[in-house]
Amino acid sequence: MPSLSALAVLATPLYRAYFATLRLRGLLADGTTLAPAQYAYGPEIFALCECDAVALAGLIAHTRLTALVALGRDGDWASGILARLGFGLVRGSSLRGGAGALAHLIRAMRASDAPGAIVVDGPLGPPGEAKPGIVLCAQRTGRPIRALGVAARPKIVFRRTWSQIFFPLPFSRVVIACEEPLTVPATTDREGIATLALELTGRLATARQRAQAALGAMRTKGRIDGVVPAYASPSTSAETCAGTQPTSGTLQAPTLGDRR
């Protein structure tokens, strides 16, 4: 049986070809839309939920990212592919190797101006809930945090995974919404870090809602129009990854086992 590293080598060109088919569109906090290649990438930390991870991996075509990847078999598989796609990787999670991984990630970010990326609700959830590690990382590096939210159509949603991670089908429309930067003062105490993590959770939900609204506008008008700026109050309750309901263009994959 081929090793994970061998499978990663074989899968990498397929992932590159797949990502090239996605019709990605970025949505800024003020409602401006642009292609991901037009975004001014800099020393910031992208916060994302695990459900959005596959779609967001396509950003590597436009910039080099430093990402935190969980330990374990699934993490080994993902890191093998991501490394070959050009990601800088640090391994660990809140359950395994967390403190050491955070220290390595901070050093990597201090040594580079490239953006970082952290899945904030892994490795086991709750879905959409930001943990404090990313806030600590922002505090110690002086980098702002940008919450990202994704909507895609058509897609496959793996309903039996804890995060309900989704896979945009080839040639899908994908909208990536980002929020205003969240800054973390160097003097922030433990209570303040917890408060900012809660605020980040809300921003992630808002970003996803804005991405969904923009994608719906694209479907009805053939373009992004009437989208919700990040500073506006959402008209409906924010959704987490697991709380998002199936919409037209969404296929369910109910037989996939939980791959925690």
Where do the protein language model's features map onto the residues?
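Membrane-anchoring hydrophobic helices of lipid-metabolizing enzymes
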Residues: 1-55, 59-62, 169, 201-246, ...
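A cross-family acyltransferase "interaction/gating" segment
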Residues: 131-189
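Catalytic core of membrane glycerolipid acyltransferases/transacylases, capturing the structured
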Residues: 43-97, 158
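Generic beta-sheet signal
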Residues: 92, 119, 147-150
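Short, hinge-like loop/turn segments at secondary-structure boundaries
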Residues: 83-86, 108-109, 163-168
